[in-house]
C-alpha cells in the first residue's frame, strides 16, 4: 500500500485529504499549521485539516516552521512514498521535497502559470475571469513553480463569490487528485514545464486591498466585492465610518457624478457612481460594530442623502 503524508490547513484542503483516505491510500501522517486563537475571545482552535485527521485517527504534526531541521525530520521519519499538499501555508524545504519515492505534489487552485500564490481564488474573481481551475504539479522550493502534471478547468459564473468558487474548486481538486495519483504511480504522466512568460501572481490579500476604489469601472467594483466575499470582505466609508460591503449589483447610471457619490436611493439599496457609466447598487452591508444586514434594513435606521460621498476619511 502506498504510504502518503498529507500537508494542508484550511477547509479547501479537507476534501482532498478525505479523497486520499477514501481511495485507500495509507495516510500515515498529516502536517498542518499550529492551533491559532480565533474570534473575539481568542479561543485556541485547530485547523479544519487537523479536525478531519483526528476523526480518522491519523497522527498530526503542527510545526511552527517546517523549514527547521527538528521539524522536517519528523516528517522524514514517517518515510512516505508520496507527499500531497493543498494550501498548507508554509514553504516546504528541499529536504522534504526530495525524499518520497513518487515525489511531492501540490493541489493548487488556479490554471498555472496564472495566479501563483496564496489567494488565487480571490484574484480569479477580482480580475473578472470567466474560468479558472485546478493544477496538480510537482513541488519545488520556488512558489508554485513546479512542473504541471494535470489540470482541469472550472467555470466562474456571473454571480460567483470567492466562497462559492472555493467550494467548487475544493471538490474539483479532490476529484482531479483521485485521477492523478494512480497515473503518477504507474509512470504514465509527462510533466510539463510552466511558461515563465505567462506567470501572474495572487499574493495574500492585504488590508489596503480590501478598500473599494470607486474610481474603477462598475464591473471592476462588482468583481472586487464578489472576490472578497465572504472573507475578508470589501469595505468603504460612509460619514467617516467603515462599512463592509457584502453585496452589490451592477446598474446603469444616467446622470454623471463623481465616483463614490450616492446617485440614487431605492428600497433595497443605494446606487453609487463609479469610474464609468455602470454604477453599483449596494444591497447588503455591515456597519462598523454591527451585524451584516440587508441595505433595506440599514436604510430604515440611516438615511444617507443623494450626493453623499463614500470612501472618504478611511
From Swiss-Prot:
One Pfam entry name: Formyl_trans_N
Organism of derivation: Bacillus cereus (strain AH187)
GO cellular component: cytosol
Catalytic function, reaction form: L-methionyl-tRNA(fMet) + (6R)-10-formyltetrahydrofolate = N-formyl-L-methionyl-tRNA(fMet) + (6S)-5,6,7,8-tetrahydrofolate + H(+)
Molecular function in Gene Ontology: methionyl-tRNA formyltransferase activity
Name by which UniProt lists this protein: Methionyl-tRNA formyltransferase
Domain of life: Bacteria
Role this protein plays: Attaches a formyl group to the free amino group of methionyl-tRNA(fMet). The formyl group appears to play a dual role in the initiator identity of N-formylmethionyl-tRNA by promoting its recognition by IF2 and preventing the misappropriation of this tRNA by the elongation apparatus.
EC number(s) stated in the UniProt entry for this protein: 2.1.2.9
Alphabetic keyword roster: Protein biosynthesis, Transferase
Binding site for (6S)-5,6,7,8-tetrahydrofolate: 110-113
Entries under PROSITE patterns matching the protein: GART
Family statement drawn from the similarity comment of this UniProt entry: Belongs to the Fmt family.
Amino acid at each position: 500500500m502506498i504510504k502518503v503524508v498529507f500537508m494542508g490547513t484550511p477547509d479547501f484542503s479537507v476534501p482532498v485529504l478525505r479523497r486520499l483516505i477514501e481511495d485507500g491510500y495509507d495516510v500515515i501522517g498529516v502536517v498542518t499549521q499550529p492551533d491559532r486563537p480565533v474570534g473575539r475571545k481568542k479561543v485556541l482552535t485547530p485547523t479544519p485539516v487537523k479536525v478531519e485527521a483526528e476523526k480518522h485517527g491519523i497522527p498530526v504534526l503542527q510545526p511552527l516552521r517546517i523549514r527547521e531541521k527538528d521539524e522536517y525530520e519528523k516528517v522524514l521519519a514517517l518515510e512516505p512514498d508520496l507527499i500531497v499538499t493543498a494550501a498548507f501555508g508554509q514553504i516546504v524545504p528541499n529536504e522534504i521535497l526530495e525524499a518520497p519515492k513518487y515525489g511531492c505534489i501540490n493541489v493548487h487552485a488556479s490554471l498555472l502559470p496564472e495566479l501563483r500564490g496564496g489567494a488565487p481564488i480571490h484574484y480569479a474573481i477580482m480580475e473578472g475571469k470567466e474560468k479558472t481551475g485546478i493544477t496538480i504539479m510537482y513541488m519545488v522550493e520556488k512558489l508554485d513553480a513546479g512542473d504541471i502534471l494535470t489540470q482541469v478547468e472550472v467555470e466562474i459564473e456571473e454571480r460567483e463569490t470567492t466562497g462559492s468558487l472555493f467550494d467548487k474548486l475544493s471538490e474539483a481538486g479532490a476529484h482531479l487528485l483521485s485521477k492523478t495519483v494512480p497515473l503518477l504511480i504507474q509512470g504514465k504522466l509527462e510533466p510539463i514545464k510552466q511558461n515563465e512568460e505567462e506567470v501572474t501572481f495572487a499574493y495574500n490579500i492585504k488590508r489596503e486591498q480590501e478598500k473599494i476604489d470607486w474610481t474603477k469601472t462598475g464591473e471592476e467594483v462588482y468583481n472586487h466585492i464578489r472576490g472578497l466575499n465572504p472573507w475578508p470582505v470589501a469595505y468603504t466609508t460612509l460619514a467617516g465610518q467603515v462599512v463592509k460591503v457584502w453585496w452589490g449589483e451592477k446598474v446603469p447610471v444616467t446622470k454623471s457624478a463623481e465616483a463614490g457619490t450616492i446617485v440614487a436611493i431605492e428600497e433595497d439599496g443605494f446606487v453609487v457612481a463609479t469610474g464609468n457609466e455602470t454604477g453599483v447598487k449596494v444591497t447588503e452591508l455591515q456597519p462598523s460594530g454591527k451585524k451584516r444586514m440587508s441595505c433595506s434594513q440599514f436604510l430604515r435606521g440611516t438615511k444617507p442623502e443623494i450626493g453623499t460621498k463614500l470612501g472618504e476619511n478611511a
